[in-house]
Amino acid sequence: MEKLMIEGGTPLEGTVQISGAKNSAVALIPAAILADSTVTIDNLPDISDVRLLGELLKEIGGEVELADQKMVIDPSKMFAMPLPNGRVKKLRASYYLMGAMLGKFKKAVIGLPGGCNLGPRPIDQHIKGFEALGAKVTNEQGAIYLRADELKGARIYLDVVSVGATINIMLAAVLAKGRTIIENAAKEPEIIDVATLLTSMGARIKGAGTNVIRIDGVESLHGCRHSIIPDRIEAGTYMILAAAIGQNVLIDNIIPLHVESLIAKLREMGVDVEVLDDQVRIRNHQEKKGVDIKTLVYPGFPTDLQQPATTLLTQAHGTSIVTDTIYNARFKHIDELRRMGADIKVEGRSAIINGKTKLQGAKVRASDLRAGASLVIAGLTAEGITELSGVEHIDRGYEDLEQKLIGLGAKIWREQMSDQEEEQVKSS
């Protein structure tokens, strides 16, 4: 196992290039199952979740080539191979295989997903959608079994706005008979990205990006070529990092509209944010002041940036309150920040941060992907050296993290853990 070593205190400067969106990639790759011919996806981030999905497509008979941020998928020999165990459980987004395989083969067996440990992430809205389309769904020994004689379009109202359920129902509905209407649909940019791919394959989808999506089923879908949108969460992470310890940082290959809620909060804190066509520049000249943040579904403040933002607010003057309305278990990073000297207490779904505090390097552990990002920011801000374990979580969602940070002047490197350190991590 590896750990990240971070020597903090060096102001960052330069340009960082944003990769393709992880949250799009993990849905676009399963979507290729629905096609009858080759699908090529460009601008893929080089992260472990993408590699894992490529391997899963091979397990069900697909031919997959992955090189230079491009995946070429030939789905013509795929079949409804059950995937109750193994790799499928390592990946939260493996649930998109349910919608895609149900849509293509009218049956699927998928082990319940893993990935980030954020408390219960129920898939009841996904199942409700599949059942409305005519599928029989059972949960047996930690795997979801789906079967349908035929899928028929339906009107589906989501009780909770869910990106995962919106995409999964789209995947299952594009080859169903008749019209499907998803009401109270999520509006995230990644949903538009998936709808764009499916439309290029021949699907008939209207309203993606609004709260009502209409899908008219078609007989078959063909291959296509698609380029993924930039990763708004990676972009936001670097914007927060630049606000915490940057002097003059240019974030390149970004859609500013997708990070509007973050731009507004940074400006409210007193950060100098310059918005260009496909770039954002962060300059840091003055003291930052505390603000209150409440996570909401898009276009509100993203839950995926709540943890990095919490770290930033330790460096702002005054009291800030961060409330996560999406995932109430997303505060595992706070104990680690406290080890570094942060003054934070958790009350229910809120973290109350008293700043400004000087953070000190410490041994800390990332419990999930975005907690890892928040602790990297903390390490770069802190005095001394921070040792960060749980690096595998970061590798799931951030491409070339160290190289991008080194390009900005950060002092960050990897080391192998000792046997004793590995034992400590496994037992904690």
UniProtKB/Swiss-Prot annotation:
EC number: 2.5.1.7
GO biological process: cell division; cell wall organization; peptidoglycan biosynthetic process; regulation of cell shape; UDP-N-acetylgalactosamine biosynthetic process
Active site: 116 (proton donor)
Short name of one Pfam family: EPSP_synthase
Gene Ontology, cellular component aspect: cytoplasm
Entry keywords, A to Z: Cell cycle, Cell division, Cell shape, Cell wall biogenesis/degradation, Cytoplasm, Peptidoglycan synthesis, Pyruvate, Transferase
Keyword Acyltransferase recorded: no
Record field: catalytic activity: phosphoenolpyruvate + UDP-N-acetyl-alpha-D-glucosamine = UDP-N-acetyl-3-O-(1-carboxyvinyl)-alpha-D-glucosamine + phosphate
Location in the cell: Cytoplasm
Binding, phosphoenolpyruvate: 22-23
MF-aspect GO terms: UDP-N-acetylglucosamine 1-carboxyvinyltransferase activity
Pathway: Cell wall biogenesis; peptidoglycan biosynthesis
Enzyme class: transferase
CDD domains: UdpNAET
Residues annotated with 2-(S-cysteinyl)pyruvic acid O-phosphothioketal modification: 116
Transmembrane domains' residue ranges: none
Residues the record lists as binding UDP-N-acetyl-alpha-D-glucosamine: 92, 121-125, 304, 326
Protein family (similarity comment): Belongs to the EPSP synthase family. MurA subfamily.
General function of this protein: Cell wall formation. Adds enolpyruvyl to UDP-N-acetylglucosamine.
NCBIfam families for the chain: murA, PRK09369.1, PRK12830.1
The protein's name: UDP-N-acetylglucosamine 1-carboxyvinyltransferase 2
